[in-house]
Every structure is written in structure tokens, then in C-alpha cells.
């Protein structure tokens, strides 16, 4: 399986999107600072993921979620989470 996932930084409230074949191991790498892109922004919380059987589908979905339309989709999909965490009122969602 291929997993597309969204993490939220608990230090700066930023978001990070990526994909992996082993979601648990990859999350552990993010938490342990083993990923250059996220090492300085942890700890991280997994807030959303999708599973795909084909790599190409996961890569396409990752690319979409990083686009403007993808950010709008995530904003709608995570509406309750973002409202509870105070993002909706500020109109803020930052996706790396």
C-alpha cells in the first residue's frame, strides 16, 4: 500500500504532505528528526491519510493535495479539526 498523509507541526502549526509505503515507520522518522524537511519543526501529529494500491495514484494525490485546489479540499475535509484548533477563524492553512 501507498499512503498519502498530512502532518501538523505541534511547534509551529504548519502542515506537511508526503507519501510513503510504511506510514508508521515514516511517522517515526518525522518524530525522531530523521527527515531533513521536517526535522526542525516537530513534534508532529498525523491528522489525515489516504491509502492507495498503486504508487502512481499516491504520487498524483500528493501532488494534488499540495496544489491550491488540494489545499481547498483539505480545508473542507478537515473543517472540524481546523475549527477546533483555531485555523478556520484565521483562514490559515500552510502546506509544505
Identify what each model region corresponds to:
Residues 1-45, 49-52, 56-66, 71, ...:
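GIY-YIG nuclease catalytic motif and its immediate N-terminal context
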Amino acid at each position: 500500500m501507498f499512503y498519502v498523509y498530512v502532518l501538523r507541526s505541534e511547534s509551529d502549526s504548519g502542515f506537511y504532505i508526503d507519501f510513503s509505503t510504511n506510514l508508521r515507520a515514516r511517522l517515526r522518522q518525522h518524530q525522531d528528526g530523521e527527515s531533513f524537511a521536517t526535522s526542525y519543526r516537530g513534534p508532529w501529529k498525523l491528522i489525515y491519510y489516504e491509502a492507495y494500491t498503486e504508487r502512481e495514484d499516491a504520487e498524483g494525490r500528493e501532488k494534488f493535495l499540495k496544489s491550491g485546489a488540494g489545499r481547498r479540499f483539505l480545508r473542507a475535509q478537515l473543517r472540524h479539526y481546523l475549527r477546533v484548533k483555531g485555523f478556520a477563524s484565521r483562514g490559515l492553512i500552510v502546506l509544505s
